[in-house]
Amino acid sequence: MEQFKGLQKTLYIWTDSADLDKRVEKVKSATGGEVALENVHRLSFSSYANSSFDLIVIECAQLTDNYVKLLHMLKPSGKLHLVAFIGPAGSLLQEVKLSGFINCREDADDALTAEKPGYETGSSARLSFAKKDASALNVWKISGDDEELIDEEDLLDEEDKQKPDPAGLRVCSTTGKRKACKNCSCGLAEELESEKQSKAATENAKSSCGNCYLGDAFRCSTCPYLGMPAFKPGEKVQLADNLLKSDI
């Protein structure tokens, strides 16, 4: 019991009341602190707070279902001392280890001693290997801090900003003369053909009433010059392209 010297608070769990005072006094003399008593059969009904004792001494330690509770009752690094146990020491030590105790051993006086870890049950600690290297993270950056950005204004010249002439975009316009190619696909062939038909229709337009030049008041309902101002007799008048075409 000398190994428990200096422990301030002890719980003594007893089974036999004979000479109980002597056994308790022995523990008190060895530790030099306070000793509380609890019957082994009343342990499951007790309501001790967590981390209440520095040492727990048990007689006849067949308490398989209560080792976890004893672990909670001990303070961090608290001691568990089993005396007068029944059965193989190896099996009992295995049960104590599985309950969360560490440094489990058999003493020379046919007793078993175990220790609670130096931290409270359910506590957490930061792990050093979880730190991330900032330089390693920068390797995967798409843009570095020293990369220069291109000025958007330098990408286009003044000539690029000028809108092109739609007529100059045609393939046929490269000849310098408004003449459609053999396999024209830019629409110039259709445009020239339309102008040709409009011109022919205008030249062949003849007045059936002879009053077309006088104005709309003297023109018939189908006059091609309807809507145009009056003109001199014999004067050539250019009609619009859509006047001689069907509306359908």
From Swiss-Prot:
Location of the motif Cx2C motif 2: 220-223
Binding site for [2Fe-2S] cluster: C172, C181, C184, C186
One GO location term (cellular component): mitochondrial intermembrane space
Pfam families: Anamorsin_N, CIAPIN1
Cystine residue pairs: none
Ranges where the record places region Fe-S binding site B: 209-223
GO BP: any one term: iron-sulfur cluster assembly
Ranges for region N-terminal SAM-like domain: 4-129
Region named Linker: 130-161
Residues involved in [4Fe-4S] cluster binding: C209, C212, C220, C223
Motif Cx2C motif 1 positions after renumbering to this chain: 209-212
Region (Fe-S binding site A) location: 172-186
Cofactor entry: [2Fe-2S] cluster; [4Fe-4S] cluster
One GO molecular-function entry: electron transfer activity
Keyword terms: 2Fe-2S, 4Fe-4S, Cytoplasm, Iron, Iron-sulfur, Metal-binding, Mitochondrion
Function: Component of the cytosolic iron-sulfur (Fe-S) protein assembly (CIA) machinery. Required for the maturation of extramitochondrial Fe-S proteins. Part of an electron transfer chain functioning in an early step of cytosolic Fe-S biogenesis, facilitating the de novo assembly of a [4Fe-4S] cluster on the cytosolic Fe-S scaffold complex. Electrons are transferred from NADPH via a FAD- and FMN-containing diflavin oxidoreductase.
Record's subunit section: Monomer.
Domain comment (free text): The C-terminal domain binds 2 Fe-S clusters but is otherwise mostly in an intrinsically disordered conformation.
PANTHER family: ANAMORSIN
Protein family (similarity comment): Belongs to the anamorsin family.
Protein name: Anamorsin homolog
The organism of origin for this protein: Drosophila ananassae (Fruit fly)
